[in-house]
Structure formats: structure tokens, C-alpha cells
Regions:
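Conserved, structured core segments of small domains
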Residues: 1-103
């Protein structure tokens, strides 16, 4: 299943990595470990942040996806299940059944 993993980089921690000259290396290492399908960097709620689109086949993969962000960046995270257009099309019969039953 695909998830959108958004994270904030606390200013103090990110600034320290930048001053040490290890910020880019740290981010590269995290991305190599997590292997996101897509990556975007932005601001989130006024802080440096990023969005990784990740794929997990099993819930046991979750620690490997989030712990690098917790340990390296002290990053608060949010996970949100996302679908591709193909996923939505595949799920449309269940959507229609629910609408008929509960709508």
C-alpha cells in the first residue's frame, strides 16, 4: 500500500546538521534507506519539511520507514494512505456498494 509520509525538520536540529555540513549526506542516507517512490521538500506548518511517497507491503516495514527520520532529524511525522488512479478505479465497486447500502 502507498502512503504519503510527511515530516517536519525541527529548526534547531536541521540548523545543526547544516552548520556541521552533514545535512545533505544525512538526507541522502535517509532516502537510500527508506527508498521512497517520490520525494518533495517544502515547508510544513512553518518548518522545513518533506514528503516521501512510500510503498509498504506489510505493517512490519513501518519502523524501517520512520525510525531514520526520528533518530537523524528528531522529526515529527504523519502517515496518510494514498491511492493512484488505478487503485481508485479498482476500489470503485466497493465505493458504489457502500453508497447503495449507506447513502
Amino acid at each position: 500500500m502507498r502512503f504519503m509520509l510527511s515530516f517536519q525538520m525541527p529548526t534547531e536540529r536541521a540548523n545543526a546538521l547544516i552548520k556541521e555540513g552533514t545535512f545533505a549526506q544525512t538526507m541522502q542516507s535517509i532516502m537510500e534507506d527508506i527508498k521512497p517512490e517520490a520525494v518533495y521538500f517544502t515547508n510544513l506548518d512553518g518548518a522545513r519539511g518533506g514528503i516521501f511517497f512510500i510503498n509498504m507491503d506489510d505493517a512490519s516495514e513501518l519502523p524501517g520507514m520512520v525510525e531514520p527520520l526520528f533518530h537523524a532529524l528528531d522529526a515529527p511525522i504523519k502517515l496518510q494512505l494514498v491511492m493512484t488512479p488505478e487503485d481508485l478505479q479498482k476500489g470503485t465497486p466497493a465505493l458504489e456498494q457502500a453508497a447503495q447500502k449507506y447513502g
